[in-house]
Amino acid sequence: RLFACSQLGLYYDIKLIRLFVAAFASTRLIILQGISGTGKTSLAYAFGKFVNNPSIVASVQPSWRDRTELFGYFNEFTKKFNETELLRAMYEASYNENIYAVILDEMNIARVEYYFAEMLSILEMPSRDEWVVDIIPNSWPSDPKHIVNGQLKIPPNMWYIGTANNDDSTFAITDKVYDRAMPINIDTKGVPFEAPLTDSVYISYKHFEYILNAAKVQFVVSEENLKKIALLDDYVIEHFRIAFGNRIVKQLRDFVPAYVGTGGTELDGLDYVLARKVFRKFESLNLSYIRDEIDGLCAYIDELFGEENMTESKDYLRMLKKLV
């Protein structure tokens, strides 16, 4: 935050920075979404500058339909592979321990599940040994060193940051994508402030992951709150026929400790995940049908966590009620 302000003239709220950093602990795909002009792309750009490895920008086009837009394709006529900047960056990343941030700029100007579906599936594999993507159908003696049997291992030091505008020119992002990503809403412009001159830092991805994993040990989500989350899950299943799911619970266990490690509170971290990962699913329901149930849900949240807490979730639910 101080680096972005002092070096780049970019202003971000401290909570937004906490959410952004914590998201790296929970998923490989971060979605920065909101209205145009709020600094979504600039935030991802500033992160690359801060860690001394400029972000790679892949400008998504409306014509993107499949994986070849990301990786390129083998031209059978010329017998040459037409590579993309992203593929070059992936190959380069396999040779060092820098942190790589790939910006999928305006990611929903095309259907995300068309061109990124394979990556979503691969990055969910529990073992990083399974993080491999097919590049060419056959292997050749002249293949680059890290292309083995036509496959390239997806580098563990790379994260993907999509920016998404919510307007009529874009496609809605599906639940399949949202479930596997961490969405962060940026709906307001940053307020200027004074900051001391702050330099960039070099941090290897291994040290970055060590810090994130250390937070999971030091700031593990309390059993009391996990029990409350389980009770809330049962309530939502009974009244709304929607379940949290194991994936979201795992992300919650990964995200919240990192959020606390950046200076946030456990309840605020839980509140954010519930609002953006669980209650967001209500938008796909018949809002007129669930309208009367929302007040009961808000009351149950107050009963579990206290009236003064979970404000983002309750505000989001009340906003949905007003849409009816």
Pin down the residues of each PLM region.
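AAA+ P-loop NTPase catalytic core and its hallmark functional loops
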Residues: 1-211
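Alpha-helical lid/collar subdomain of P-loop NTPases
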Residues: 156, 196-324
